[in-house]
């Protein structure tokens, strides 16, 4: 193009407000524009602004927009716009969406062979980098969708030795320990402990110590619970308990130096309860007290008082001298008066708490005495020791022997919990189920291995029953509420005991309790048996109760018996005799029977006692085996106004002699029959001797009669004289016979004379009887002995038997010593 033309074509700078030249317009020189100049004038301009907003002078330079025709071969993709509050997360999401759009655009163009593979590889690398960043940061790193995160975790879990898997397990361990510690309390501590042992507490002991200290500092009322938890774990894993104690002492020292009263109070409270649980030695408690009381200030006194209230009972039992020294120091500080009135009042309250024996601050609360003192391991860590708090245990660190350490802890866990589930993986399905059953059977006793020796459940049950009874308006409401109480199987007797104890505590008997017992007895057989068992127990121990309690208990059981709540067969435990009863038991039986008579009447009670089926149960109350016991029982029941029930025993006493005689006869017959069966020869010989004795006695009676007849008629037969000559004595002189025969009548009947003699002297003394033989009024005794000289040497005291010789059947042995010569001689066997 000519230079002149180019100079004329190049336009001057113009303002944007100027309108472009029209195609048919011409220059001032009268020449038209060339076609090369048309595109320069074919651009779109922005609308003209308001004339008032136009600048005073046009711009010196013009900015021309990039022509779209020059970059028509590049694909233009708009950057996605993501709305998110977090700028880092918004940027990451925008990059991800942009990458996705680029891949889709390249796939549409057909260039997927090289570019797409490179893009996918970079995406995986980015994801892994984000996952590594997630594991290495506290905040969690960039956002990863849950599904993608689970996929990455599953991929990392394939290699258990990798740092990623160890970090995942570390995070899970930390969350589990925190969750279990945050939800522990008195009621569920027995279930939390096995779950804690299920986690690797050796690897996570730092996490456990940090978590339990944080939880205790944020909730001081639960300090005894956390101390009991640490005490249980300390019995199996002492290094865990020692680490907690070391960190607590270190934290107390730092807080004391910083004058942080809140942290000092929380930490000292935890240490006090660890001392109560025998995890920490009492030396550290005494050191803390002496440190706080050495240079007393208001804050140190407040910490010391709070610490002493928690550990005072423990020190009074285990270190009484040191405890007295501490209280003497408290008294000295109080008398010095250098502290505020508030702290002085706190010390006075502490002395009152000590006087009350720490009833509101027990060393170990109810339900937390879960460890035997012999099993506990006590750590002697003091304030002056060099402590290793091991803060590195709170942070994650890859373990090159991770798998081996996990297996070791699994062995420890099986030893603690009795769990054996590692061998079930290589067995069949049936064997696997059997092994699970065996595991359950093995684990169950271990869970119950932490025995509660304080009977907390029993105490809570009794408290519930007592409050339920006291809060009821009538017996029906009480029974309805008590039936809803969850009473363990085999503990039904506790409800009966509580009802009876509540009844005994009243000033006077209330029928409210009797109706409760009656309703329970009629609801189910279990309660009937329980109240019958309670009757036997209270009868055996009734001597322990006061008179008022005894009366209430007796009336309660009297109501149950009268209403047929319990069987009358329970009275078999009553033995009414002097040896087996006491004054308390007799009073108890009296009150029971009087209550029964008051409700039923004496007639019905007496009829009930006569029921044949129940008589064996009443054998002890109405004894008929011994007159002494029967007499005692009759006197007892008569004295209490129940003589009507003793009629059978009175009849027994009347017939007792006859019964005793019959019993003795039967006993003698039994003994004789036993002796008769010894030998047949003894029986025959004894029968022969008895027959000989009987024959001799009969012959003697006949001979004595004939002698009397002969003496009266003065003409004895020759046989009679022959028998007399056969006797040991010589023949009697006739003078003796004449003297004895003259006073008698010539021919009296022998029988009549004998009766007349008997009638004259029915019971004469010995001398009168001797005179009666001669019929003389006063015969000299010496003459009579002279007449009796026909016998060789008759002893004087034997002569009284001569008068008995006239009887029809005198004893055989005494016939030999009769003074009458006319008496026959004894049989030869008796000689």
Swiss-Prot record:
Keywords tagged on the record: Cytoplasm, mRNA processing, mRNA splicing, Nucleus, Spliceosome
All copies of domain MIF4G, residue ranges: 174-357
GO biological process terms held by the UniProt record: mRNA splicing, via spliceosome
Compositional bias annotation for Low complexity: 1-17
Composition bias type Acidic residues, residue spans: 433-443
Molecular function as annotated in GO: RNA binding
Basic and acidic residues biased stretches: 73-89
CC terms in the record's Gene Ontology section: catalytic step 2 spliceosome; cytoplasm
Keyword Nucleus belongs to the record: yes
PROSITE patterns: MI
Subcellular location(s) of the protein: Cytoplasm; Nucleus
A Pfam family recorded for this sequence: MA3
InterPro entries (UniProt xref): ARM-type_fold, CWC22_splicing_factor, Initiation_fac_eIF4g_MI, MIF4G-like_typ-3
Residue ranges, annotated region (Disordered): 1-89, 414-450, 670-831
SUPFAM superfamilies (alphabetical): ARM repeat (SSF48371)
Quaternary structure note: Associated with the spliceosome.
Function: Involved in pre-mRNA splicing.
Entry similarity comment: Belongs to the CWC22 family.
Name of this chain's protein: Pre-mRNA-splicing factor CWC22
Source organism of the structure: Cryptococcus neoformans var. neoformans serotype D (strain JEC21 / ATCC MYA-565)
């Amino acid at each position: 193009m000519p230079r002149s033309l180019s100079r004329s074509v190049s336009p001057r700078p113009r303002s944007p407000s100027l309108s472009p030249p029209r195609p048919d317009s011409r220059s001032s020189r009268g020449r038209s524009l060339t076609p090369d100049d048309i595109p320069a004038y074919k651009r779109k301009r922005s609308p003209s602004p308001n004339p008032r907003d136009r600048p005073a002078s046009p711009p010196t330079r013009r900015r021309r927009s990039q022509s779209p025709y020059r970059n028509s071969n590049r694909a233009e993709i708009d950057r996605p716009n993501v709305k998110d509050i977090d700028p880092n997360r918004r940027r990451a999401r925008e990059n991800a969406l942009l990458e996705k759009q680029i891949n889709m655009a390249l796939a549409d163009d057909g260039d997927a062979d090289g570019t797409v593979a490179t893009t996918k590889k970079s995406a995986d690398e980015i994801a892994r980098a984000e996952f590594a960043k997630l594991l290495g940061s506290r905040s969690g790193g960039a956002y990863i969708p849950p599904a993608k995160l689970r996929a990455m975790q599953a991929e990392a879990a394939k290699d258990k030795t990798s740092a990623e898997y160890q970090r995942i397990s570390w995070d899970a361990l930390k969350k589990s320990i925190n969750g279990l510690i945050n939800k522990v309390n008195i009621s569920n501590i027995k279930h939390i402990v096995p779950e804690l042992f299920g986690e690797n507490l050796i690897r996570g002991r730092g996490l456990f110590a940090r978590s339990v200290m944080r939880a205790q500092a944020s909730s001081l009322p639960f300090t005894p619970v956390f101390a009991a938890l640490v005490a249980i774990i300390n019995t199996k894993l002492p290094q865990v308990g020692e680490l907690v104690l070391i960190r607590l002492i270190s934290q107390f020292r730092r807080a004391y130096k910083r004058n942080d009263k809140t942290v000092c109070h929380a930490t000292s409270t935890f240490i006090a309860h660890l001392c109560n649980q025998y995890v920490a030695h009492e030396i550290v408690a005494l050191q803390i007290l002496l440190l706080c009381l050495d240079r007393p200030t208001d804050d140190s006194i407040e910490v010391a008082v709070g610490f002493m209230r928690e550990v005072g009972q423990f020190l009074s039992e285990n270190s009484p001298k040191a405890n007295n020294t501490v209280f003497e120091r408290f008294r000295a500080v109080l008398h010095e008066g250098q502290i505020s009135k508030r702290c002085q009042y706190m010390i006075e309250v502490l002395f009152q708490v000590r006087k009350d024996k720490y009833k509101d601050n027990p060393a170990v609360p109810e339900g937390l005495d879960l460890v035997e003192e012999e099993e506990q391991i006590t750590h002697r860590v003091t304030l002056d020791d060099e402590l290793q708090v091991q803060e590195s245990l709170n942070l994650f660190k890859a373990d090159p022997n991770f798998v081996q350490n996990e297996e070791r802890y699994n062995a420890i866990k099986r030893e603690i919990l009795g769990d054996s589930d590692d061998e079930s993986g290589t067995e069949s399905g049936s064997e696997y189920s059997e092994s699970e059953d065996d595991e359950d059977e093995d684990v169950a006793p271990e869970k119950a291995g932490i025995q509660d020796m304080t009977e907390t459940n029993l105490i809570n049950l009794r408290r519930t029953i007592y409050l339920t009874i006291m809060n009821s308006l009538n017996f029906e409401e009480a029974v309805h509420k008590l039936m809803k109480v969850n009473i363990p199987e085999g503990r039904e007797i506790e409800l009966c005991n509580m009802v009876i104890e509540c009844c005994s505590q009243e000033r006077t008997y209330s029928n409210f309790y009797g109706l409760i017992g009656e309703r329970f007895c009629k609801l189910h057989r279990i309660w009937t048996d329980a109240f019958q068992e309670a009757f036997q127990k209270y009868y055996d121990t009734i001597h322990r109760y006061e008179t008022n309690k005894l009366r209430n208990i007796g009336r309660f059981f009297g109501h149950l018996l009268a209403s047929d709540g319990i069987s009358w067969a329970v009275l078999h435990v009553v033995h009414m005799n002097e040896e087996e009863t006491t004054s308390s038991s007799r009073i108890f039986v009296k009150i029971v029977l009087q209550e029964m008579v008051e409700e039923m009447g004496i007639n019905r009670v007496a009829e009930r006692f006569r029921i044949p089926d129940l008589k064996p149960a009443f054998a002890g109350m109405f004894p008929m085996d011994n007159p002494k016991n029967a007499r005692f029982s009759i006197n007892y029941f008569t004295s209490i106004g129940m003589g009507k029930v003793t009629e059978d025993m009175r009849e027994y006493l009347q017939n007792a002699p006859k019964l005793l005689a019959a019993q003795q006869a039967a006993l003698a017959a039994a003994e004789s029959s036993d002796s008769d069966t010894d030998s047949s020869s003894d029986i025959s010989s004894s029968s022969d001797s008895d027959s000989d004795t009987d024959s001799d006695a009969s012959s003697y009676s006949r001979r004595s009669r004939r002698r009397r007849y002969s003496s009266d008629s003065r003409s004895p037969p020759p046989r009679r004289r022959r028998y007399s000559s056969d006797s040991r004595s010589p023949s009697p002189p006739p003078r003796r016979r004449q003297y004895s025969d003259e006073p008698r009548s010539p021919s009296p009947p022998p029988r009549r004379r004998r009766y007349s003699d008997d009638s004259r002297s029915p019971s004469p003394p010995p001398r009168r009887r001797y005179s009666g033989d001669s019929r003389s009024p006063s015969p000299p005794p010496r003459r009579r002995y002279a007449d009796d000289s026909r016998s060789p040497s008759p002893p004087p005291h034997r002569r009284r038997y001569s008068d008995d010789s006239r009887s029809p059947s005198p004893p055989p042995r005494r016939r030999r010593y009769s003074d009458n010569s006319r008496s026959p001689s004894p049989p030869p066997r008796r000689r």
